[in-house]
């Protein structure tokens, strides 16, 4: 009798186990779940470093028989990967035609100091915005969104007759994509 009870208990437990197994579970056909996102093209000018020429000496060092005054600065950009871009530099706040100029002491006929900006070396390829006689710097697409920094080469031509004082200008950097 104990054996029959044991057998009945085993059969009942086995039946319950089979009924709960996936073989007997109800199911429906599987359906794909669509997951989407879009990544927009985006670029920003993320940093700049001033083009600081330092002292200009029109009497000896930078006179017409002297040397040009050269220096560098930089423009940093961050862009969506795979996005080809260009960086434009406008003519500045004090330009005369296509000539960039730094403003000096007010009220002087010699209140401007001419300068130029370049993409590759002082006196090399002029860096502009396409409207100021020079082209933007075209950049190949990046494989990541890390900041990329580009050197801005600056030159103040020798032989300018300017008054004593501080000279400055502001150039707008724009990333086009």
Language-model regions, residue ranges each:
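Surface-exposed, low-hydrophobicity beta-strand/loop segments enriched in small/polar/acidic residues
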Residues: 109-114
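Bacterial N-terminal signal peptides that target proteins for export
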Residues: 2-11
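Short linear motifs in low-complexity, proline-biased tails and propeptides
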Residues: 119, 124-127, 163-166
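Classic N-terminal secretory signal peptides
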Residues: 11-17
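N-terminal small/polar-rich segments of proteins
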Residues: 25-108, 137-177
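Extracellular beta-sheet repeat scaffolds used for adhesion and glycan interaction
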Residues: 122-146
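Predominantly extracellular/luminal cell-surface or secreted proteins
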Residues: 90-92, 116-120
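N-terminal signal peptide c-region/cleavage motif recognized by signal peptidases
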Residues: 20-22
